[in-house]
Amino acid sequence: MPIQIEVCIDNLESLHNAINGGADRIELCSSLALGGLTPSFGFMKKAAAISSVPVYAMIRPRQGDFLYDNDDISAMIEDIHAAKLAGLQGVVFGVLKANGDIDMPLSTRLMKIANDNDLGVTFHRAVDQCSNYKKAIENIAELGCERILTSGLAANAYDGMTVLNDMVKLANGRFKILAGAGVTAENAKEIIEKTGVTEIHLSGKSTRPSKMKLMLDGVKMGAGDLDDFIVPVTDSKKIDAVRQNIK
């Protein structure tokens, strides 16, 4: 079975680069520096018009944990509908209870809305903060998700290979395990061979300098350690290098 490469992006320039590099699927986000948040409707709609591969929108209304209140859930529901209206193929979400278990009532509610809109569903890395990943595997199978995006409960997929391999065995073909976090051309093949995953997730991140001619110092648009004149983008060569190295 060919290995599927999913690329997470948070701007349209990166979308073009990811597709040119050979991405099989796109995870559409805003704010990748925060772990990925829900993209705007305009971004979703434009991505759907441009992309030649399936696009799944991140449904995450804020940074931080995955314990959401009623307002958050209402926003997530609206965003799932927006993903369908924009013409996307799927959504990505994860909802936990305070004790670290998957919130099954809320997850079931979100799944129904996605299913009613003919959207595929990836359960995201909230699973890496679950109290018991083996229980989470069964919960996600019950929900009917297509896949789990996970690092194997580690800081990166390479360090999580043992758990990733166990997850593949526990999933037993009921859904895919999508290995993500720190996946590169240098380690992708080893991760695949040692875990048995058939899908990998990466950003292929790089940066480019701003094309602005006027660059004023002293006025920051965000955190002080961020350079407003350096633009994070996906590097198509990094995506292609992964594809070539896993052949």
From Swiss-Prot:
GO molecular function: copper ion binding
Superkingdom: Bacteria
Alphabetical keyword list: Cytoplasm
Compartments, as annotated in UniProt: Cytoplasm
Pfam families (alphabetical): CutC
This protein's GO CC annotations: cytoplasm
Classification via InterPro entries: CutC-like (IPR005627), CutC-like_dom_sf (IPR036822)
Family affiliation: Belongs to the CutC family.
Protein name per the record: PF03932 family protein CutC
The species this protein was found in: Aliivibrio salmonicida (strain LFI1238)
Lineage: Bacteria, Pseudomonadati, Pseudomonadota, Gammaproteobacteria, Vibrionales
Name of the coding gene: cutC
